[in-house]
Amino acid sequence: MSIKNIRAREIFDSRGNPTVEVDLYTCKGLFRAAVPSGASTGIYEALELRDNDKTRYLGKGVGRAVKYVNEFLGPALCTQNLNVVEQEKIDKLMIEMDGTENKSKFGANALLGVSLAVCKAGAAEKGVPLYRHIADLAGNPEVILPVPAFNVINGGSHAGNKLAMQEFMILPVGADSFKEAMRIGAEVYHNLKNVIKEKYGKDATNVGDEGGFAPNILENKEALELLKTAINKAGYPDKIVIGMDVAASEFYRDGKYDLDFKSPDDPSRYISPDKLAELYMSFVKNYPVVSIEDPFDQDHWEAWTKFTAASGIQVVGDDLTVTNPKRIAKAVEEKACNCLLLKVNQIGTVTESLEACKLAQSNGWGVMVSHRSGETEDTFIADLVVGLCTGQIKTGAPCRSERLAKYNQLLRIEEELGSKARFAGKNFRKPVFN
């Protein structure tokens, strides 16, 4: 089934910034995809093309990316008579047309919008759910429901508080199903709201970009204490573990780290990577912290390797690896981390995302599928995580519709699978099939 027409437009993401949406038409109908964008972006990510016209959307318009889809990528794909099930062929053609290392000609946001829409159309052409089509593309005979990592306390670049570390997450690994994991997560979230309100007042329960609370606390340990209290109040101390996304590149300063980076600069308070690693180890010792993402700067390889060897927990590469096979290969060689954060817009096509996932998994790593802080109502990543069998997803708190859109889609998938549904649970790092 060939492509009849492709049209792109500017729409808005959850932060009110323009982003790219693509409509792809085949004789089976219309297939629509929207592209997310991040706030704390790694310097090695594929280029998200913005207009940089300060008179329009403060320079954040995506008119050029839309134009490239409508005038170049779309017409080229329509005239090639390609079948939408040929995901790799279509993605490789777009990559060749762009011709740059980081997709800077057309923009990763232009390519990704088309790539996602093609994938949705491919599933319809085969008459299968999107997650099954993705599983086929990845060579997975089985599918698995992930453990959700709910980002319930926000700091860093995602919130206006003093907290340096960006995300404090709860993972209901003790649940028996995705549906139960959602219930546990929602109950802890509401308990946390009450705990924060009692301690810091009602305005402390305002939410950040990803639906988590952003109380004005400075000590990262205090965020963990709040989580511990809420988990106990909800009655789930044996069913929940904690994950963190430190996003340390955001407060990296000349080989050291500034845990009060939102205050006026003061080099005397910077701490060494060893001191920061000690702080992480104290978290692991005193709280059920089992996963830490981006504990150090994206180029601080030595600190990563040392910490991964010593910590014994899941160490997730995001800014370090940027879903890029070259960066992943280097991280494997350096033993810098043991889990990949998979963000489709960091690399720009479905095919390359699948390649990155397979590379990580073949080297014994875990993989966590992720949203971005600037999201849309698109639910592609819910099907992606099921099809790729990664066992873990982070797509915000159980709050804000652009976050719940993904979680609700996972509930539907679990229901559709019925007795065949398998939930990763405690095996979230390396899901197993019985």
UniProtKB/Swiss-Prot annotation:
Residues reported to bind substrate: 158, 167, 293, 318, 370-373, 394
Pathway(s) this gene product operates in, as recorded in its UniProt entry: Carbohydrate degradation; glycolysis; pyruvate from D-glyceraldehyde 3-phosphate: step 4/5
Cofactor: Mg(2+)
A Pfam entry, by short name: Enolase_C
Catalytic activity, reaction form: (2R)-2-phosphoglycerate = phosphoenolpyruvate + H2O
Active-site residues from the entry: 210, 343
Residues reported to bind Mg(2+) 1: 40
GO terms classed as biological process: glycolytic process
Example of a GO cellular component annotation carried by this entry: phosphopyruvate hydratase complex
Cofactor note as given: Binds two Mg(2+) per subunit. Required for catalysis and for stabilizing the dimer.
Cell compartments where the protein resides: Cytoplasm
E.C. number: 4.2.1.11
UniProt binding sites for Mg(2+) 2: 245, 293, 318
Primary location: cytoplasm
GO molecular function: magnesium ion binding; phosphopyruvate hydratase activity
Annotated SUPFAM superfamilies: Enolase C-terminal domain-like, Enolase N-terminal domain-like
Keyword field: Cytoplasm, Glycolysis, Lyase, Magnesium, Metal-binding
Domain of life: Eukaryota
Family per similarity comment: Belongs to the enolase family.
Subunit architecture: Homodimer.
Stored NCBIfam families: eno
PANTHER family named among the record's database cross-references: ALPHA-ENOLASE, ENOLASE
Name of the protein described by the UniProt record: Alpha-enolase
